[in-house]
């Protein structure tokens, strides 16, 4: 394959990748696909990678319309790129109108991106089968309950667009669990165990029954009543479900259904002393709520095995269990307990701190719920483990917010450029949006005694040397004459953009000092970039997204004449 032919091939792949992911191609994804589909190029991988990087840089400078137009000139995307995804696979045994699913979070904090997967998958299947989605708050561990989480979960689901048909809170259902426990004891499917916990573990690990297992139901019911009336202290008695004592999974053997917790529950106070474990309450509720399908991660397979014993002992029909692969979310804090500790210690500012992966943090950054939903549905319901792609999420979000995001200039760690030799003011008219007729914004370079001033981005200033020609976007060309510590001095060179191109000039954004407003941008690592934004940004409302040209998209958090505070979304 000749060099030009290779470059044309790479360009097509880059255009297709950009069209698919919000107007920006990913060089790694382009390279991977080329190597997969053109094995003959593998010996030239180094050369191909160099070409990929060059071409991707070119494509990523194009507008969405330019990308679409060039793809159409090439005959449109290839079939494998253009065809629709197969979507979610059918649920086993599902009948339209007779599907009941549940989303069952623990109220230890608000929802994060991992919760979103379960919520979206259940919601999507409920919609597809005209079914019912139950929200069940699983709060039977008094030590893992945050009272504020109940409302936060509801708010997060509403923002995510998840439709809830029925709502239940397990701490309101304790008496029901007691009734089922008594029935289980009557049927001799469970027993009260008063063994020392360490001794029980020793017996369990070697596959032997403890002495308590042989108690008759009358004695078990008496001991159960003593558990309820406070005769026993925490750790002295539990209710165990009968299983095979030598079950291959030691975690399943004689698992605990009820235990004593001597701590007040944030919602019920000290009313209850005996609490069901998650596995017992879940099994009971899945039956009583007529759940037909349980969608859960593979890491819950052991829980499924445990819960089935309750169904078997009580003669209940089991739901269909569908276990999907584990979703790895790299570079993000998901643990609500870890986040809570960080909030309490002052490390994090709150549940929406940009360093954590809660839905609140993503919302604060300007991530659309639709982008989250699409990214989750792309992963689908597969038993293969997957890694959550932040790049795919950002690409989808970019595609959604780009049309509604006005453009402005923001210079970080600004360096002042003094432009000598300017005889008259230059009025720069810039579009609010490059592809849509949204009006314009105006910046003015106004000389005083022949000297105009402009603030440049610190990174751009670092690349300028004496003798360089730099173009201030939509304004003038300036020749750099002197580079100082934190300042530049230049001389007016020309107006025409074509001259700048001939000179190989660096093209930079800029802000006039007298038309600037202080601006801070909170980055994903919690750091803050400070500088000045053009004053035109003050016309925007807090909560809107904008693009700081040549930098990134942000969500405006505070907008006033005193300054702007924004939160980084993505490039």
Swiss-Prot record:
| Reaction equation(s) it catalyzes | tRNA(Glu) + L-glutamate + ATP = L-glutamyl-tRNA(Glu) + AMP + diphosphate
Q: Where is this region: Disordered?
A: 75-98
Which subcellular locations apply to this protein? Cytoplasm
Alphabetized InterPro entries for the sequence: aa-tRNA-synth_I_CS, Gln/Glu-tRNA_Ligase, Glu-tRNA-synth_arc/euk, Glu/Gln-tRNA-synth, Glu/Gln-tRNA-synth_Ib_cat-dom, Glu/Gln-tRNA-synth_Ib_codon-bd, Rbsml_bL25/Gln-tRNA_synth_N, Ribosomal_bL25/Gln-tRNA_synth
Q: Where is this motif: 'HIGH' region?
A: 105-115
EC number annotated for this UniProt entry:
6.1.1.17
What keywords tag this UniProt record?
A: Aminoacyl-tRNA synthetase, ATP-binding, Cytoplasm, Ligase, Nucleotide-binding, Protein biosynthesis
**For this UniProt entry, what's an example GO CC term?**
cytosol
Any GO BP: amide biosynthetic process
Top enzyme class: ligase
Q: Does the keyword Protein biosynthesis apply?
A: yes
Q: Where is the composition biased (Basic and acidic residues)?
A: 75-88
The UniProt record lists the keyword Lyase: no
Note one Pfam family from the annotation: tRNA-synt_1c_C
- Say which family it is in: Belongs to the class-I aminoacyl-tRNA synthetase family. Glutamate--tRNA ligase type 2 subfamily.
Q: Which HAMAP family match?
A: Glu_tRNA_synth_type2 (MF_02076)
PANTHER family registered for this protein in UniProt: GLUTAMATE--TRNA LIGASE (PTHR43097:SF5), GLUTAMINE-TRNA LIGASE (PTHR43097)
Function, in words = Catalyzes the attachment of glutamate to tRNA(Glu) in a two-step reaction: glutamate is first activated by ATP to form Glu-AMP and then transferred to the acceptor end of tRNA(Glu).
Output this protein's name: Glutamate--tRNA ligase
